[in-house]
A protein has these predicted regions:
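Hydrophobic alpha-helical topogenic segments used for membrane insertion/localization
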Residues: 2-32
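N-terminal cap/lid segment of alpha/beta-hydrolase-fold proteins
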Residues: 39-61
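Structural signature of beta-strand start/N-cap positions in the alpha/beta core
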Residues: 75, 101, 141-143, 170-171
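Conserved alpha/beta-hydrolase "nucleophile elbow" surrounding the catalytic nucleophile
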Residues: 80-82, 146-151
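Active-site loop/oxyanion-hole signature of alpha/beta-hydrolase fold enzymes
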Residues: 107-145, 149, 164-165
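Conserved catalytic-core motifs of eukaryotic protein kinase domains, centered on the activation segment
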Residues: 88-90, 113-119, 183-186
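Flexible "cap/lid" loop of the alpha/beta hydrolase fold
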Residues: 155, 159-198
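Conserved HGGG/HGGXW glycine-rich cap/lid loop of the alpha/beta-hydrolase fold
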Residues: 59, 64-112
Length: 198
């Protein structure tokens, strides 16, 4: 015999989860549109200038550069975490003002960058970071800073282009990141639910 109370609760929970996903997707699309239309004031308003870097697969990446640095200063490139944007680094940008050239970028599918094809991988983000370096810091010393997914992006770049590390990339800072295997973590949830969380 089927327990109708339990079934009703399960359907209610599924309905709430579905509604939450739909609301989140719509809110993300609206926020991205507003960001692209310039409604938000963020890091660019603090003196940086924007450039677009187009990747080898045609995705346009939004990059902000703060050039207030002495000649020969390193370029510090910040890579944000999952579901964040280049606006994640205001304190760091301020602390480095006048000491280093600061580059902030929105990883694909985040902030004002284009989304690209479905199924984007961390390896792809590493290739994107290589394009950013080539476009906005083709010469000189580079320091890479990555938070969460941004740290994984840096590690993917190191795997993809190890020759950059040492001659060009002089230092790396990895903040609250992982060396991989994130998709295998179930967060203590049943497998189908854990897959939704990723």
């Amino acid at each position: 015999m089927v327990d109708m109370g339990r079934t009703a609760k399960g359907l209610t929970a599924l309905g709430i989860l579905t509604a939450g996903v739909v609301v989140g997707a719509v809110a993300e699309r609206l926020a991205t549109r507003r960001l692209r239309e310039g409604e938000f004031v963020g890091i660019e308003a603090a003196g940086g200038h924007s450039v677009e870097v187009v990747t080898d697969d045609g995705v346009s990446l939004h990059v902000v550069i703060h050039d207030e640095a002495p000649p020969g200063a390193p370029t510090v490139i910040f890579s944000h975490g999952y579901a964040l944007s280049l606006d994640s680094w205001p304190g760091q940008r301020e602390s480095l003002r006048g000491l280093a050239r600061v580059v902030l970028w929105d990883q694909r599918g985040h902030g004002a960058s284009q989304r690209g094809t479905p199924g984007t991988t961390i390896d792809r983000l590493g290739v994107d970071l290589g394009h950013v370096i080539d476009a906005v810091a083709p010469t000189g010393d580079v320091v890479l800073v990555g938070h969460s997914m941004g740290g994984m992006t840096i590690m993917a770049l190191a795997d993809h282009a190890p020759n950059l590390f040492g001659p060009r990339v002089k230092a790396v800072a990895l903040l609250a990141t992982s060396a991989g295997g994130i998709a295998d973590i179930d967060l203590g949830l049943p497998r189908p639910v854990a897959r939704l969380a990723h």
